A protein has these predicted regions:
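Membrane-anchoring alpha-helices and their flanking helix-loop junctions
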Residues: 1-93, 105-174
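Catalytic beta-strand/loop module used to bind and position nucleotide/cofactor moieties
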Residues: 96
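Histidine-centered phosphotransfer motif of kinases
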Residues: 99-105
Length: 174
């Protein structure tokens, strides 16, 4: 992260993260969709695929927003965006009670939606690259969080899935 952002007020930090997310998850897929190939035939199936794609984009954006809002609400008073990738607190509420990585899951959903909408190989390739990066980063972050939070994070690892929510195990209360 840039040094100038180290002590930025959190509202300004949220705005900068939002602008970055729009660039990464809207502008980049659009530009990739313009690479090579002719326009595909139009018709009811295409319209349905685009509609489903746009719904997937909206769902992913909503999940990302919910995750960001959970961080905003959980941040201690006086907290400012700093250069660490992970905050100084363990967040277990909001979407983080269902998935350890709701931001990545939301981002992947946005890219999946654009891939369905644009139906271009370059956008599908972008989705694959994003998913591979998210998987690698999530494993790296888990090691850092285990070091930082110890047993609390180990419990969280056992209770909450990495990506998608799962049903409770039989005989256990949630």
């Amino acid at each position: 992260m840039l040094r100038c952002m180290k002590r930025m007020p959190r509202t300004a930090g949220v705005l900068i993260w939002t602008l970055g997310a729009v660039a990464m998850h809207a502008v980049v897929p659009f530009e990739l969709s313009r690479l090579g190939g002719r326009a595909r035939p139009q018709g009811p199936a295409t319209s349905a695929a685009r509609g489903a794609g746009l719904l997937t984009v909206a769902a992913g954006a909503a999940l990302m927003t919910w995750a960001l809002a959970a961080h905003y609400q959980a941040a201690p008073r006086g907290w400012a965006l700093d250069s660490r990738l992970t905050p100084g607190y363990l967040l277990r509420r909001g979407p983080y009670r269902l998935s350890r990585n709701p931001m990545y899951a939301g981002e992947a959903a946005v890219w999946l939606g654009w891939a369905r909408c644009y139906r271009r190989p370059a956008v599908w390739a972008g989705l694959a690259i994003q998913c591979a990066a998210f998987a690698a980063i999530a494993r790296w972050e888990e090691q850092r969080l285990l070091t930082r939070f110890g047993g609390d994070y180990q419990d969280y690892l056992q209770q909450v899935p990495r990506w998608a929510p799962r049903s409770p195990k039989r005989g256990t209360a949630r």
